[in-house]
Regions:
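Sequence-structural signature of mature extracellular/luminal beta-sheet repeat domains
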Residues: 1-292
Length: 292
């Protein structure tokens, strides 16, 4: 945020929380459900991907929380608007084309004032939802299903010039790119390689993708969980990638998100979800300034 604070979504308790420079926490709003990705819109409000809540397993020996399946009594998720001055929470979108949003996960605004968001879906003991990519307007006047189905889509981001949209699929460890034709419209195909997208990387082994940020050089920095938790930095032309592992005391099996801040955007703030921490790491390149 411009004042040097951070906004953090908390899935377990459904809170949108402000983190001060000294680490003090302040409640911004209780959104209920599970607060996942958050972005600031053109009106200065926070737009929240609320996944409707999840079961969590607590590992007492490590003081870790690990995500689980769809909870009992689950009714769905949606997009919420939070007034950062008053804490007022309003549901903006809960349905698309008559279908209830299941578990919105990550969100990014374009320079037109609209936003792309993913719906990750929910898992149950014997099956799970199919997910998708959506586009909405901040005034509540339009929400559109753009790509469906996708395999557990998670992080979403945009290239520095806004000409491409990136989506990470969690369980298969894949990062895709699509060209933007106009706001809410991608150059895609109904058949072929995942709606005609360009595969930038598919991770080997048991490594899963979560949320992302883009740096000023256009590299896509994807939070990674699994056997090699850390940040996977993917070149925008798909020519290769590198992997950053956080050493002690920052080791955590659930590196789930990254954003850039500081006066020169060379500080990476990374969420370590199992241990419930946000850490600041010096980054070799400036991050990409967000549109709002």
């Amino acid at each position: 945020m411009p004042d040097g604070t951070l906004l953090v979504g908390q899935i377990v308790n459904g809170n949108l929380t402000r983190v001060l420079a000294d680490g003090t926490l302040e409640l911004v709003a209780h959104c209920g459900g599970g607060v996942n990705g958050v972005a600031i819109g053109p009106d200065g409000a926070a737009y929240v991907c609320n996944n409707g809540g999840s079961e969590h397993a607590y590992v007492a020996s490590r003081n870790w929380y690990l995500p689980g399946d769809q909870p009992e009594g689950f009714t769905g998720g949606g997009i919420q608007r939070v007034d950062l001055q008053t804490g007022e929470v309003r549901w903006l979108y809960t349905h698309v084309d008559g279908h209830r949003l299941r578990a919105p996960n990550d969100i990014v605004f374009d320079h037109h004032g609209g936003f792309w968001f993913t719906d990750h879906g929910k898992g149950r003991s014997r099956d799970r939802d199919r997910g998708g990519l959506y586009y909405g307007k901040a005034d509540g006047s339009l929400v559109r299903e753009v790509l469906y189905p996708l395999d557990a889509p998670n992080g979403v981001g945009m290239s520095p010039d806004g000409s491409r949209v990136y989506v990470a699929e969690t369980f298969v460890g894949r990062l895709w790119a699509w060209d933007v034709v106009e706001p809410g419209v991608l150059r895609s195909k109904p058949k072929g390689r995942v709606h005609g997208g360009e595969l930038l990387v598919g991770l080997p082994g048991y490594d899963l993708f979560d949320s992302m940020a883009v740096d000023s050089d256009g590299n896509v920095c994807v939070a990674t969980i699994g056997d090699h938790p850390g940040i996977t930095i993917v070149r925008p032309d798909g020519s290769g990638y590198e992997h950053l592992v956080l050493d002690e005391p920052f080791t955590d099996p659930m590196n789930t998100n990254i954003c850039f801040g500081g006066p020169d955007l060379r500080t990476a703030y990374i969420t370590l979800s199992a241990s419930g921490r946000v850490v600041a790491v010096d980054w070799p390149r400036p991050g990409l300034a967000l549109n709002y």
